[in-house]
Amino acid sequence: MKILGINASPRGSKSQTLRLVKTVLNGARSRDCEEEFVDLCKLNIEYCEACGVCYKSGKCRKKDDFQSLYRRMLSADGLVMGSPTYFRLVSAQMKTLFDRMADAVHCQLLTGKYTVNVATSGGLHNDREVTKYLNGIMLTFGSYVTGSTGTSVALGSGAMDAVEKKAFRLGKKLAEDIRVRRVYLRQERIHKENSAYFRQLVEMNKDEWIHEYDFWSRQKR
Protein backbone atom coordinates (compact mmCIF):
# COMPACT_ATOMS: atom_id res chain seq x y z
CA MET A 1 0.00 0.00 0.00
CA LYS A 2 1.39 3.36 -1.03
CA ILE A 3 0.39 6.71 0.43
CA LEU A 4 1.43 10.07 -1.01
CA GLY A 5 1.48 13.14 1.22
CA ILE A 6 1.31 16.59 -0.37
CA ASN A 7 2.17 19.68 1.65
CA ALA A 8 1.02 22.97 0.08
CA SER A 9 2.62 25.33 2.58
CA PRO A 10 5.45 27.56 1.28
CA ARG A 11 7.09 27.83 4.73
CA GLY A 12 9.45 24.88 4.28
CA SER A 13 10.72 23.22 7.44
CA LYS A 14 8.94 25.85 9.59
CA SER A 15 5.53 24.75 8.30
CA GLN A 16 3.05 23.41 10.83
CA THR A 17 1.05 21.98 7.92
CA LEU A 18 4.11 19.98 6.89
CA ARG A 19 4.27 18.69 10.45
CA LEU A 20 0.69 17.41 10.27
CA VAL A 21 1.10 15.82 6.83
CA LYS A 22 4.18 13.93 7.99
CA THR A 23 2.43 12.85 11.18
CA VAL A 24 -0.38 11.27 9.16
CA LEU A 25 2.24 9.54 7.01
CA ASN A 26 3.97 8.27 10.15
CA GLY A 27 0.70 6.79 11.34
CA ALA A 28 0.24 5.02 8.02
CA ARG A 29 3.82 3.77 8.09
CA SER A 30 3.19 2.21 11.51
CA ARG A 31 0.65 0.03 9.67
CA ASP A 32 3.22 -1.10 7.09
CA CYS A 33 2.37 1.41 4.36
CA GLU A 34 4.95 2.76 1.97
CA GLU A 35 4.82 6.55 2.15
CA GLU A 36 6.11 9.38 -0.01
CA PHE A 37 6.18 13.10 0.78
CA VAL A 38 5.98 15.97 -1.72
CA ASP A 39 6.63 19.62 -0.92
CA LEU A 40 4.30 21.15 -3.50
CA CYS A 41 5.80 24.63 -3.28
CA LYS A 42 9.17 23.36 -4.50
CA LEU A 43 7.59 22.25 -7.78
CA ASN A 44 6.94 24.31 -10.87
CA ILE A 45 3.23 23.97 -11.60
CA GLU A 46 1.76 26.64 -13.84
CA TYR A 47 -1.81 27.90 -13.95
CA CYS A 48 -4.49 26.09 -15.92
CA GLU A 49 -5.43 28.03 -19.06
CA ALA A 50 -8.68 26.15 -19.75
CA CYS A 51 -7.40 25.10 -23.18
CA GLY A 52 -9.24 21.76 -23.04
CA VAL A 53 -6.32 19.72 -24.36
CA CYS A 54 -6.54 17.28 -21.42
CA TYR A 55 -10.20 16.61 -22.30
CA LYS A 56 -9.16 15.65 -25.83
CA SER A 57 -5.92 13.78 -25.16
CA GLY A 58 -5.70 13.00 -21.45
CA LYS A 59 -2.47 14.99 -21.23
CA CYS A 60 -1.64 18.58 -20.39
CA ARG A 61 0.29 20.57 -22.96
CA LYS A 62 2.32 22.42 -20.32
CA LYS A 63 5.83 21.12 -19.74
CA ASP A 64 6.22 21.54 -16.00
CA ASP A 65 6.19 19.36 -12.89
CA PHE A 66 2.47 18.66 -12.94
CA GLN A 67 2.47 15.45 -14.99
CA SER A 68 5.04 13.75 -12.76
CA LEU A 69 3.10 14.60 -9.60
CA TYR A 70 -0.20 13.66 -11.23
CA ARG A 71 1.13 10.22 -12.13
CA ARG A 72 2.24 9.68 -8.55
CA MET A 73 -1.20 10.70 -7.29
CA LEU A 74 -2.90 8.27 -9.66
CA SER A 75 -0.60 5.40 -8.69
CA ALA A 76 -1.04 5.90 -4.93
CA ASP A 77 -3.59 3.97 -2.88
CA GLY A 78 -4.04 6.84 -0.45
CA LEU A 79 -3.41 10.58 -0.32
CA VAL A 80 -2.72 13.05 2.46
CA MET A 81 -3.53 16.60 1.39
CA GLY A 82 -2.32 19.45 3.59
CA SER A 83 -2.71 23.20 3.25
CA PRO A 84 -2.41 26.29 5.41
CA THR A 85 -5.37 28.65 5.49
CA TYR A 86 -5.00 31.71 3.29
CA PHE A 87 -8.02 33.99 3.55
CA ARG A 88 -10.33 31.07 4.42
CA LEU A 89 -9.14 28.88 1.53
CA VAL A 90 -6.25 26.62 0.55
CA SER A 91 -2.94 28.10 -0.53
CA ALA A 92 -2.50 29.26 -4.12
CA GLN A 93 -0.20 26.32 -4.78
CA MET A 94 -2.85 23.78 -3.77
CA LYS A 95 -5.56 25.56 -5.74
CA THR A 96 -3.32 25.62 -8.82
CA LEU A 97 -2.79 21.86 -8.53
CA PHE A 98 -6.54 21.24 -8.31
CA ASP A 99 -7.23 23.51 -11.29
CA ARG A 100 -4.88 21.40 -13.41
CA MET A 101 -6.85 18.24 -12.53
CA ALA A 102 -10.05 18.95 -14.45
CA ASP A 103 -9.66 15.72 -16.42
CA ALA A 104 -9.54 13.81 -13.12
CA VAL A 105 -12.88 15.31 -12.14
CA HIS A 106 -14.60 14.54 -15.45
CA CYS A 107 -13.34 10.95 -15.39
CA GLN A 108 -13.49 10.45 -11.60
CA LEU A 109 -9.88 9.26 -11.67
CA LEU A 110 -9.38 9.09 -7.91
CA THR A 111 -12.12 6.47 -7.57
CA GLY A 112 -11.05 3.73 -5.17
CA LYS A 113 -8.52 5.88 -3.34
CA TYR A 114 -8.69 7.14 0.24
CA THR A 115 -7.72 10.55 1.55
CA VAL A 116 -6.91 12.31 4.81
CA ASN A 117 -6.97 16.12 4.73
CA VAL A 118 -5.22 18.44 7.18
CA ALA A 119 -5.02 22.20 7.60
CA THR A 120 -3.63 24.88 9.90
CA SER A 121 -4.72 28.48 10.34
CA GLY A 122 -3.75 31.69 12.07
CA GLY A 123 -7.37 32.70 12.56
CA LEU A 124 -9.54 30.92 15.09
CA HIS A 125 -11.07 27.72 13.64
CA ASN A 126 -10.55 28.84 10.01
CA ASP A 127 -8.76 25.54 9.43
CA ARG A 128 -12.19 23.90 9.57
CA GLU A 129 -13.26 25.78 6.45
CA VAL A 130 -10.19 24.50 4.62
CA THR A 131 -10.60 20.87 5.68
CA LYS A 132 -14.27 21.07 4.68
CA TYR A 133 -13.19 22.40 1.28
CA LEU A 134 -10.55 19.69 0.87
CA ASN A 135 -13.00 16.98 1.87
CA GLY A 136 -15.46 18.19 -0.77
CA ILE A 137 -12.83 18.46 -3.49
CA MET A 138 -11.44 14.97 -2.90
CA LEU A 139 -14.96 13.53 -2.89
CA THR A 140 -15.56 15.27 -6.21
CA PHE A 141 -12.45 13.59 -7.64
CA GLY A 142 -13.93 10.22 -6.63
CA SER A 143 -11.87 9.51 -3.51
CA TYR A 144 -13.22 8.35 -0.18
CA VAL A 145 -12.38 10.70 2.68
CA THR A 146 -11.14 8.77 5.70
CA GLY A 147 -11.12 11.90 7.83
CA SER A 148 -9.62 15.32 8.43
CA THR A 149 -8.14 17.44 11.17
CA GLY A 150 -6.55 20.80 11.77
CA THR A 151 -5.92 23.53 14.29
CA SER A 152 -5.41 27.23 14.81
CA VAL A 153 -1.71 27.62 15.56
CA ALA A 154 -2.36 30.71 17.71
CA LEU A 155 -3.98 28.41 20.28
CA GLY A 156 -0.49 27.33 21.27
CA SER A 157 1.66 24.22 21.35
CA GLY A 158 -0.89 22.26 23.35
CA ALA A 159 -3.44 22.50 20.54
CA MET A 160 -0.85 21.38 18.00
CA ASP A 161 0.20 18.45 20.16
CA ALA A 162 -3.43 17.32 20.46
CA VAL A 163 -4.09 17.53 16.74
CA GLU A 164 -0.87 15.63 16.01
CA LYS A 165 -2.20 12.72 18.05
CA LYS A 166 -5.38 12.75 15.98
CA ALA A 167 -3.36 13.02 12.76
CA PHE A 168 -1.35 9.93 13.72
CA ARG A 169 -4.56 8.00 14.41
CA LEU A 170 -5.96 9.13 11.06
CA GLY A 171 -2.84 7.78 9.36
CA LYS A 172 -3.47 4.37 10.92
CA LYS A 173 -7.13 4.54 9.96
CA LEU A 174 -6.18 5.49 6.39
CA ALA A 175 -4.02 2.39 6.13
CA GLU A 176 -6.82 0.22 7.50
CA ASP A 177 -9.38 1.71 5.10
CA ILE A 178 -7.12 0.89 2.18
CA ARG A 179 -6.45 -2.61 3.47
CA VAL A 180 -10.12 -3.57 3.92
CA ARG A 181 -11.40 -1.41 1.02
CA ARG A 182 -13.86 0.31 3.34
CA VAL A 183 -17.03 1.71 1.75
CA TYR A 184 -18.48 4.89 3.24
CA LEU A 185 -22.13 4.68 2.21
CA ARG A 186 -22.96 8.40 2.19
CA GLN A 187 -19.80 9.14 0.22
CA GLU A 188 -20.57 6.27 -2.14
CA ARG A 189 -23.94 7.85 -2.95
CA ILE A 190 -22.17 11.10 -3.79
CA HIS A 191 -19.70 9.22 -5.99
CA LYS A 192 -22.51 7.54 -7.93
CA GLU A 193 -24.30 10.85 -8.47
CA ASN A 194 -21.08 12.51 -9.63
CA SER A 195 -20.19 9.64 -11.96
CA ALA A 196 -23.61 9.75 -13.61
CA TYR A 197 -23.43 13.51 -13.98
CA PHE A 198 -19.92 13.68 -15.42
CA ARG A 199 -20.56 10.75 -17.77
CA GLN A 200 -23.55 12.65 -19.15
CA LEU A 201 -21.55 15.87 -19.39
CA VAL A 202 -18.78 14.14 -21.33
CA GLU A 203 -21.26 12.41 -23.65
CA MET A 204 -22.78 15.81 -24.44
CA ASN A 205 -19.32 16.99 -25.53
CA LYS A 206 -18.09 13.75 -27.11
CA ASP A 207 -17.01 15.35 -30.38
CA GLU A 208 -14.63 17.69 -28.54
CA TRP A 209 -13.67 15.72 -25.43
CA ILE A 210 -12.40 12.67 -27.31
CA HIS A 211 -10.18 11.17 -24.60
CA GLU A 212 -12.81 11.52 -21.90
CA TYR A 213 -15.54 10.05 -24.11
CA ASP A 214 -13.32 7.06 -24.89
CA PHE A 215 -12.70 6.63 -21.16
CA TRP A 216 -16.40 6.58 -20.24
CA SER A 217 -17.23 4.33 -23.19
CA ARG A 218 -15.05 1.66 -21.59
CA GLN A 219 -16.73 1.91 -18.19
CA LYS A 220 -19.70 -0.21 -17.14
CA ARG A 221 -22.95 1.61 -16.47
Predicted region positions:
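Short, glycine-/small-residue-rich phosphate/pyrophosphate-handling segment
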Residues: 92, 106, 110-151
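Residue-level signal for alpha-helical context at structural boundaries
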Residues: 66-69, 112-116, 133, 152, ...
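Active-site/pore-lining binding-face segments in mid-to-C-terminal subdomains
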Residues: 135-189
